[in-house]
């Protein structure tokens, strides 16, 4: 019998690799609401958004320090984003329904989730923008994983380094008021379409990490 997690992950198998589950109007409505909230509460400063491609595929790859990161990222980018999130989030029927409506893609971590990678690749090939947090989590070893680089390599989509500043402090218990948040977009890293090789993905991930850490 399949485990609960396997069942939840199987829910992600939509027609055309999940592309039909993406509701752009729903996403944009949520973006306007949460974007206005974040900008008002945290006086969000956006730097370098003009560097982002207006159309076509791109892989957005920020650092990850807080559960607030996805909301801030969505608020700062005018285009619809397909977020990659841990499959555990779909354990809640309500949250899973919301995430599906927003076009998020769940990934079963630690097992090389081929379905999630395929759906992200198809989204890029359809000209969409996807967002992946290479660190994967806001706690633990926080190693920079190769998923974003691998997707960029197999699709030739530009890889965009992004630095989120202040999101960890924004939710800390000892904060005073609402600290100002800043998001900085770096120059997109142009990637030539190539075979998905571990060595190339590792080198590209190292380049991405250096680019993110250089943004201030």
For each feature predicted by the language model, list its residue ranges.
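A transmembrane-helix-recognition feature enriched in membrane-embedded lipid enzymes
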Residues: 2-51, 92-102
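Non-catalytic C-terminal accessory region of glycerolipid acyltransferases
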Residues: 2-26, 115-216
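Short, basic, glycine/proline-bearing loop/turn elements
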Residues: 33-35, 101-106, 131-136
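Catalytic core of membrane glycerolipid acyltransferases/transacylases, capturing the structured
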Residues: 39, 52-111
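Glycine-rich, highly charged phosphate/nucleotide-binding loops
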Residues: 41-45, 109-117
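Generic preference for hydrophobic
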Residues: 46, 60, 83-84, 104, ...
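A short beta-turn/loop motif at secondary-structure boundaries
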Residues: 50-53, 175-176
């Amino acid at each position: 019998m399949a485990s609960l997690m396997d069942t939840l992950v199987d829910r992600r198998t939509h027609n055309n690799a999940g592309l039909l589950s993406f509701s752009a109007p729903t996403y944009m409505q949520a973006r306007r609401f949460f974007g206005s909230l974040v900008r008002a509460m945290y006086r969000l400063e956006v730097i370098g958004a003009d560097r982002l491609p207006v159309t076509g595929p791109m892989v957005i790859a920020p650092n990850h320090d807080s559960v607030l990161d996805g909301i801030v990222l969505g608020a700062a980018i005018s285009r619809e984003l397909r977020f990659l999130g841990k499959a555990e989030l779909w354990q809640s029927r309500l949250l899973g329904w919301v995430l599906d409506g927003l076009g998020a893609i769940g990934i079963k971590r630690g097992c090389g989730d081929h379905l999630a990678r395929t759906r992200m690749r198809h989204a890029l090939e359809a000209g969409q923008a996807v967002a992946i947090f290479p660190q994967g989590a806001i706690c633990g070893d926080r190693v920079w994983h190769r998923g974003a680089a691998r997707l960029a390599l197999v699709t030739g989509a530009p890889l965009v380094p992004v630095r989120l500043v202040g999101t960890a402090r924004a939710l800390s218990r000892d904060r005073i008021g609402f600290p100002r948040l800043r998001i900085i977009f770096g120059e997109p890293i142009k990637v030539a379409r190539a075979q998905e090789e571990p060595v190339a993905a590792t080198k590209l991930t190292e380049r991405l990490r250096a680019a993110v850490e250089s943004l201030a």
